[in-house]
């Protein structure tokens, strides 16, 4: 026996001090401080193991500044079946725990730190119905020699292990020393037992429900039928002896206390009060009907004393009724617990609100007065973190107040833990029971357990709650000592849970569900504030769980990436519809930058050349920004500056170095872009996080700024790299080998430009139009997107090209790619049909434009007959842009009037001049012919006239062009030099281009020639211009032509020129148009139109001195004025016009200078 005692003593010396040291240090040593130092030089797997393990072989599952949850080194689950009904119990005062099913009980030292915890196994007596019997209730008792006084030593410092009481059916079995029966079968251990038959009607379904070790008085147990039994376990000599207290031994009654219960009443709480003396202790009893009693029990006195007997149900109900009217009829009493003040108790109750299907759990502090058998409700408040209804009838919520076990505790703060079936709510309140110092909560928090975790028992000590689970052993909920309020900033509720999920959720077999209960009400502002704090800590590596450095930057980045993924997963599950899209985008941006750093780091560390360029870029940045950054500080502490430096790096690599480097360098740069932008941003950031995890719509953008990876420099670099690498591969004949990389770059570019378009549509139009950077980005896309598709088609990625173009609605790219396919193939035809249906109007219009641009008119008109109506609509909406094609369709459709109008619109309008002369003539002739097929009632004579006028103008242009080519005409000698000669030369060059010349230019060109025919033609054109010229221009040109006729006539070479031209004017009846003036001195000398504005409008497009040409025209007018110095010119004009008019029998109105018919 002595050897055994030595062995036990040695085992305690090995194990207990470790546990004692741990318990003493938990309040001062937080998990992160303990593990931080050794995180430096370990692998990722080793790090995770080390990160969450303590030196006593326990494993931390979560921690914040208020509590720690960890598992003790206990694995009793292997001894039981998963289907077994288990009961558990821990007595921290004794220092042992137990778990039992209906066959056996396991008992172990709860403070053991051994890897393989030794167990004491006690089998139960086998009965015929054991397989269907309920598991017995078991409780531990103090060692026989244990000092139970208030000044007793810690029981774990004593040698004896204590005893065990089993309530099996109606029988109580007591073993004084559990070590003496370890692993003995029941027959061998039976001689060590002491038994007592209890008046429990087990055959009628009555069973032990609650048990309380209230030593030194004995034990108290209650049954499911509301009966209570007090049993002493030792006689007056201290020897083991089970004895049912006389208090329960009255005939025809279930017990002396039974008068307070009815068939619907059950005991919900048995709690110990203080030890009053040798063998005497107070016990508190609460029922579900609100009856509360205080009893003084003694091991030597068979007559317990009842000190308090009250019903608190109606009082609690009344305290809730005003705020919660639904409390009436739904109030349930669950548990009670004594507070530090021996006269006060904390009660847990619940009420149910059917309108929202929520259960509110209420903590009521009640002060009792034993002298008057009365009570007062001091405070009432509701738990805010747990609102589920209790559906498991076997589980009742329980209150634990660890500080109560510390007799010398003078802390003004009381920690309260409420254990629910799948959660533990922890709160701290002020412990002062003073009406001027209300018992308001300091804080409240919740630790949720996984749904598959079953709680089978519990226990607690001065600092912790211990929860026995069926699957995970013993979980310790350690409440930290209250810190000074000013020592650290208060950590918000959301941030606390976010941090726990980030840093602890990936621990293997973690029993904690880190997601918040959905019923918790949290305001958006506090949620977003806390989420921003956590994201900043991970991003800038200043979170308390993030190591300052690991072996490599890659390892450090990977750790933070995993933390950020945990963070985003938690956000998605708990706050996805409670935070703004802007915050989501901010979180995504941080993750993407971090991920991009990882990808970037993995590439440049493999290339000395790229690494040197990066270091030089970083040095230049430091020089310009007056910084002292290193790659390490950028990646670890300042990743927000990485995009700026990365942009400078890419610009230098792509635009400076790329063309002159070898193919391997170019391949590395291409891989770098794909790894960073495609893998790091598009796949792992945008696709996985933005759209799949956080469920953002592509249209949801932060209108205040563009996404971090979209700016002109990035887009320009990626676009340039794509083409430079393509050309390099083509030169060495390896383009097909790198087609997958090129495809990724195209996907990058399309996504970036698409996001830019979405964002730009949210901005004010004025600010967009005024921003050159935005214009440059738009131009970059317009200039290059068709070429991206062209390259992909080159490497036979037409299918992928079509998919991309379809997805991003790049219809011009889609059409271009479809046109590279066999147009007669059934698959191609099917694709066209698909896109006609998918984009009914847009695709058709884009296809029509492409076919017109590439002169595939046969396909336009005949290949897609089912699109005929859409084609007509296209021509109508795009008129007159595509009128040169629309008329063909209109003629084929028999719409001759429409065809005539279309052709008129594209030829008659002077602003459309510049097209081919022959094409314009063709259009006009077809329009004229179409008029012959138009019904008379629908024919527009004015339109027909305009068509004829334009045909006449074209004839005039062809005439002068041919004469100039043949040398049959020449410029008047007066214009051999000067600005007018320059205008002449310019217009002659325009004639050579065989495009339609403006009517005003044509008139002026004719007026510069020196023969009668050339000077008469512009007069004919001006008389029938069909309103092609406005009034001022026409007036100016009339004066210009007549003036030059008069001046040429005044010279020797132009004698009788004026008379001949006037005669031809009357012969062809040009004056019949009232807009046609006859020559007069006033008309020839009119200077009113010769303003700088008019000259600029008329001659501004010519590269000549406008002042010079204005002076030359003034000189012409001056010469006319000289000719009329003696009024001779006026007389000559009248006589010439009069003689010709008389000959033709016309009457001249000299006041208006017109002919009267």
Curated annotation (Swiss-Prot):
Q: Any further remarks?
A: Present with 3060 molecules/cell in log phase SD medium.
For this chain, the family text in UniProt reads: Belongs to the nucleoporin Nup133 family.
Primary subcellular site in the record, as a coarse category: nucleus
Organism of origin is Saccharomyces cerevisiae (strain ATCC 204508 / S288c)
GO MF terms held by the record: structural constituent of nuclear pore
Query: Which InterPro entries does the entry mention?
Result: Nucleoporin_Nup133/Nup155_N, Nup133-like, WD40/YVTN_repeat-like_dom_sf
User: Which PANTHER family does the entry mention?
Assistant: NUCLEAR PORE COMPLEX PROTEIN NUP133
Bilayer disposition of the protein: Peripheral membrane protein
User: What keywords appear on the UniProt entry?
Assistant: Acetylation, Membrane, mRNA transport, Nuclear pore complex, Nucleus, Protein transport, Translocation, Transport
Set out the biological process GO terms recorded for this chain's protein: cellular response to heat; double-strand break repair; mRNA export from nucleus in response to heat stress; negative regulation of transcription by RNA polymerase II; nuclear pore localization; nucleocytoplasmic transport; poly(A)+ mRNA export from nucleus; positive regulation of DNA-templated transcription
Assigned GO CC terms: chromosome, telomeric region; cytosol; nuclear envelope; nuclear membrane; nuclear pore; nuclear pore outer ring; nucleus
Its domain description in UniProt is: Usually mRNA binding pumilio repeats come in 8 copies. In the 8-fold symmetry of the NPC the 8 repeats may be provided by eight copies of NUP133.
Q: Which domain of life is it from?
A: Eukaryota
The gene name on file is: NUP133
Any idea where this protein resides? Answer: Nucleus, Nuclear pore complex; Nucleus membrane
The UniProt record lists the keyword Cell membrane: no
By its UniProt entry, which Pfam families does this protein fall under? Nucleoporin_N
Q: What does this protein do?
A: Functions as a component of the nuclear pore complex (NPC). NPC components, collectively referred to as nucleoporins (NUPs), can play the role of both NPC structural components and of docking or interaction partners for transiently associated nuclear transport factors. NUP133 is involved in nuclear poly(A)+ RNA, tRNA and pre-ribosome export, in GSP1 nuclear import, in NPC assembly and distribution, as well as in nuclear envelope organization.
Residues bearing the modification N-acetylserine: 2
Complexes and interactors: Component of the nuclear pore complex (NPC). NPC constitutes the exclusive means of nucleocytoplasmic transport. NPCs allow the passive diffusion of ions and small molecules and the active, nuclear transport receptor-mediated bidirectional transport of macromolecules such as proteins, RNAs, ribonucleoparticles (RNPs), and ribosomal subunits across the nuclear envelope. Due to its 8-fold rotational symmetry, all subunits are present with 8 copies or multiples thereof.
The name under which this protein is listed is Nucleoporin NUP133
| Required for normal NPC distribution: annotated span | 44-236
